[in-house]
Amino acid sequence: MENRKAGEFFITSISLTNQHKESVEISKLITGFRMYESIFKKYCTAEIHFIDGLNLIKNFRFTGQEYVRIAVKMKVGIGEKADNLDSVDKVFRVYKAGSVKRLNDTTQAYVLNLCDPHMFSCERKRVSKVLRGSYDKMLQNILVEDAKIPPSEFDQWESTVPENHQMIVPNWKISKFID
């Protein structure tokens, strides 16, 4: 009989890509992995714990522009992988490499903290304008025109009524406007 736990998954791929478009598969180096999605936060975040014997921080030319692609599939049945609808394939941006511990002369362990790439643009960009229309049209306007998020990335969009609201946005970050 197989010993199964709720929420088990298969890591299909975890790859690290630097600003020079060089990519390395790091899924075999992972010792811990957490991905967070909250109804109280606007962005997905993740953290990866791994042991590095290749000295990736130096040899892979870390500069703060790295991306990590995480692809996982849920476990369904006995040892079977879920279809693509029930899987996660997401790109994150590395915003912190921390908790560095040297294990021996050639090996170190550390944590990469990751966030949704849109978090950077929404926290950096400020908006000053007057918006008119329904709340959903105002939000979509800001996300598409100012945050440069293509409408194809919206998984779900609900229309709101009435359509005759007016809002003044006084030099707010896009993240504050979303709240």
Task: Briefly describe each language-model feature range.
Residues 103-179:
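Charged- and aromatic-enriched interaction segments used to assemble
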Residues 1-126:
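Assembly/oligomerization scaffold segments
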